[in-house]
Amino acid sequence: MIRVEGLRKQLTGEFTLAVDELVIEDGERVALIGMNGSGKSTLLKLIAGEWAPDEGRILCDGSAATIGYQPQSPFCFRGTVEKNIRLGMRDEAIDLDALLADCGLTELKQKKVSDLSGGERQRMCFARMLAGNWPCLLLDEPLSAVDIRTSRSLEGALVHRCEEQGTTLLMSTHLPAQAMAVSTKILLMDAGRVIEYTDTADFLHPQSEFGKEFIAQWEIRK
């Protein structure tokens, strides 16, 4: 379980992230959504321990060693796709070939990272995170450079593995269909605040005025 209490983080300018209370139960898959600059990446960095809060606390069952975090621009090691993914494996029992197939990387297994396109590189980093079998995954726009068809396949692989392993997921995305596909709950942010936090099935009927406006924009973008 992840519990956030009285969290505050002042960034440059006037932006302050302020989350009074947030609880993410074990095994939940939470899609983190909102406009650019709403605080999604900031919240992920704080939970991941990349940044320290100015106030408040974040409580996680287990330790930082149980959390896998992928930022928007993840680091890639030199060498092949296979080497990169193996470096992310915490358990040698992982079926690497099955994971490569799930992520559409079988044909790229021996390709050098330097020769990959942006979308291929992002798929590789995504597969590397799945290879870790983390109890908790924090993913910041992990499929933003991937085409829609490939994204649908990767979303399915993510959900399947999370359900199979009981993984807790917190993933930011700007795509409505993706948020609905991967999540059991949706967290909507604006100006560093949590506006809505509800079951995915109920999100299309928001309580707040901002939520209603946001949903209307989503409908236009579908």
Where are these regions (language model features)?
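H-loop/switch region of ABC-family ATPase nucleotide-binding domains
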Residues: 173-174
